[in-house]
């Protein structure tokens, strides 16, 4: 054992934290007999809960007891729900009561809390399983007593609000020993009908014992398994039943359920009238804008005298046509002149041009070009090409001229060529 010394406060805080960390003590249900009850002027209630073998100090603060539907007294058998903690100043453990159920109803409240906790752990109450109600149901099944005021209120309200909806009454007992099984069977029967859109399950108000069938597990599971959406409508506004938690929608009263399940035809007519007015107004503004647009278009010069615009465009087209012809002709002329210049250049470089000035092109019989008199011999046959034809010649005689000789012969030949060109 540790020899470290602690203070009373430290030990008390340690024990307090131990109790707070214990999950089983955070939401505990305790049954016992009230003794030493005191309702303090502050509004808080102080009492002891006891049985044959032990007693437990309890406190129920004002913000928890203000809505109790009974007055606790000594000797009363109750079930309380709360958290176990330590009152540090006195060093005593006690129960901080959150809820209290009166004599005779304690077992029912206990059963209610236990079933609620069980189904909650299974996830049956989760929002992910809630089905959406159709906006305009065609057929509604009502599972309730055929003789109570609740069914009359629902039928009258549904017929008044949305007469297009048909109602199927499935009569069942809503209190007593066999009520739960009949309610479950009624829900199952409604689901066997293909065209049922919504199921209303409920009754008018009553005591806890009277509405107890709606706190049973078989009714809860029937609601959860329903293919059609279910509205729970037990006529009690302050407390909830298990059916309220598991259903797709909870209504505080049967009449409220009827108002929730169908739209109000008066409101629908008002909405249709409003939509009609808005549509008419939108169409009128659209028509007016289009009409104004037409007036503006008709007021334009092109619409007043379209032939003037056509005549102007025709003149522009003719002008562009003439301009195009001039440009094409000018471009053609430039290309033709350039072509003629190139032809003249090519012609000036042509051998035929030289032959046309009196020269000839000489080849041997084998086609070799004769560049000098030394390339031929007597009796050779030569081919002479002129600018306008050719001829074959036989060499009878050849004469050689030396380069060193007087240039007079060359000048004479040049003068002869110039005379020939002038001619």
Swiss-Prot record:
Domain of life assignment: Bacteria
Cytoplasm keyword on record: yes
Reaction(s) this enzyme catalyzes, per UniProt: Exonucleolytic cleavage in either 5'- to 3'- or 3'- to 5'-direction to yield nucleoside 5'-phosphates
GO MF annotations, alphabetized: exodeoxyribonuclease VII activity; nucleic acid binding
Entry's localization field: Cytoplasm
CC annotations in GO: cytoplasm; exodeoxyribonuclease VII complex
Ranges annotated as spanning the membrane: none
Any single Pfam family the record assigns to this protein: tRNA_anti_2
Keyword Thylakoid: no
Major site of localization recorded for this protein: cytoplasm
Listed HAMAP family: Exonuc_7_L
Summary of subunit composition and partner proteins: Heterooligomer composed of large and small subunits.
NCBIfam families according to UniProt: xseA
Protein name in the entry: Exodeoxyribonuclease 7 large subunit
């Amino acid at each position: 054992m540790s020899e470290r010394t602690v203070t009373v406060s430290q030990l008390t805080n340690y024990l307090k934290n131990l109790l707070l960390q214990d999950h089983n003590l955070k939401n505990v249900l305790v049954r016992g007999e009230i003794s030493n009850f005191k309702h303090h002027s502050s509004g808080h209630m102080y009492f002891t809960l006891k049985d044959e073998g032990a007693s437990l100090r309890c406190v129920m603060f004002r913000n928890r007891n203000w809505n109790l539907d009974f007055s606790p007294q000594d000797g009363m058998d109750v079930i309380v729900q709360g958290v176990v903690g330590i009152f540090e100043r006195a060093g005593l453990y006690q129960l901080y009561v959150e809820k209290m159920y009166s004599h005779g109803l304690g077992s029912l409240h206990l059963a209610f809390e236990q079933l609620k906790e069980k189904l909650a752990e299974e996830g049956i109450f989760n929002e992910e399983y809630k089905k959406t109600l159709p906006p305009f149901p065609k057929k509604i099944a009502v599972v309730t007593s055929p003789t109570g005021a609740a069914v009359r209120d629902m039928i009258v309200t549904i017929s008044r609000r949305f007469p297009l909806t048909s109602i199927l009454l499935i009569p069942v007992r809503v209190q007593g020993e066999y009520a739960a099984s009949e309610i479950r069977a009624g829900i199952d029967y409604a689901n066997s009908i293909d065209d049922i859109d919504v199921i209303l399950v409920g009754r008018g108000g009553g005591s806890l014992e009277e509405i107890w069938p709606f706190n049973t597990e078989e009714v809860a599971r029937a609601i959860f398994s329903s293919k059609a959406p279910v509205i729970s409508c037990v006529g009690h506004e302050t407390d909830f039943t298990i059916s309220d938690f598991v259903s797709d929608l909870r209504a505080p009263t049967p009449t409220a359920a009827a108002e929730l399940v169908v739209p109000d035809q008066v409101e629908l007519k008002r909405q249709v009238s409003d939509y009609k007015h808005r549509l008419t107004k939108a169409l009128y503004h659209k028509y007016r804008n289009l009409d104004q647009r037409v007036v503006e278009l008709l007021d334009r010069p092109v619409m007043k005298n379209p032939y003037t615009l056509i005549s102007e465009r025709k003149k522009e087209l003719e002008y562009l046509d003439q301009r195009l012809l001039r440009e094409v002709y000018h471009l053609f002329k430039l290309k033709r002149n350039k072509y003629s210049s190139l032809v003249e250049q090519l012609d000036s470089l042509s051998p035929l041009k030289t032959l046309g000035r009196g020269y000839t092109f000489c080849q041997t019989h084998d086609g070799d070009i004769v560049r000098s008199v030394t390339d031929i011999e007597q009796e050779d046959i030569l081919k002479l090409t002129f600018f306008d034809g050719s001829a074959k010649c036989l060499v009878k005689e050849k004469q050689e001229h030396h380069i060193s000789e007087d240039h007079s012969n060359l000048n004479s030949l040049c003068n002869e060529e110039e005379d020939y060109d002038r001619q």
